[in-house]
Amino acid sequence: GYDTSFYDQSGVALLKKDDNKLGGLYQHAETRLEESPIIGELSIKNAADLPEFTGFDRYLYASGGARVEGAELTATLIEASGFEKVEGLVTLSPLDNGTYEINGQTFDKVILSCGAWLGQTLEPLGFEVDVRPQKGQLRDYFFEGMDTGRLPVLMPEGELDVIPFAGGKISVGASHENDQGFDLTVDGTVLASLEEEAKTYFPDLS
């Protein structure tokens, strides 16, 4: 077996700026249950059930919502696949017999899962795709003695999420920056903006 502690089905609380629209969101989620039973049980609850959070009166709760440490998930999937992992820049060249050459090796089929690099991978082959990098910044906070592990993920309407983890950790974000390319430089202005928005829902960040 594999360690799956990076995944925790903590539930999710979804918010609407107009909470009268929660009923419609509930009905939409219900229609998805048959094909996605992992959504879990659905209910509209009062904010009093989540005293740690503020800024709303009601929320839609889905018990199947979960938080995940993405890097650990990726590493586990790669390990479980049993495939050889080769790190580095690759080039893809189609051959006349319908196969593909990648860095000196030949393959019958190729699955491209290169995310934001898809465009530059396909460009030499004459393809254009509307795929671009999007920079996403998160900010982590740690609260000593706070039982954050029992809290659900909070998803207000918009781009911000408040993601509690066990051990007093709270993550807020992410930013969705379409004009930064592959620049991974931390932008303090963006992080300050995320914090200010998150305080609406989790005042303990102050």
Feature annotation, model-predicted:
Residues L15, L92-P94, D161-P164:
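A structural signal for short hydrophobic beta-strand segments in well-ordered beta-sheet cores
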Residues A80-E84, Y201:
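A structural motif corresponding to the C-terminal end of an alpha-helix
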Residues N103-K109:
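Core beta-strand elements of the Rossmann-like FAD/NAD(P) dinucleotide-binding domain
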Residues K21-L22, V68, L92, W117-Q120, ...:
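Glycine-rich nucleotide phosphate-binding loop and flanking beta-alpha elements
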Residues D3-D8, C114-S206:
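Active-site substrate-recognition segment that forms the wall
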Residues E84-E101:
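A conserved short coil-to-beta-strand element within the FAD-binding core of flavoproteins
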Residues G1-E52, F56:
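Dinucleotide-binding Rossmann-like beta1-alpha1 core, especially the glycine-rich loop
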Residues K17-G23, L60-E79, T185-V190:
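Short beta-strand to alpha-helix junction loop
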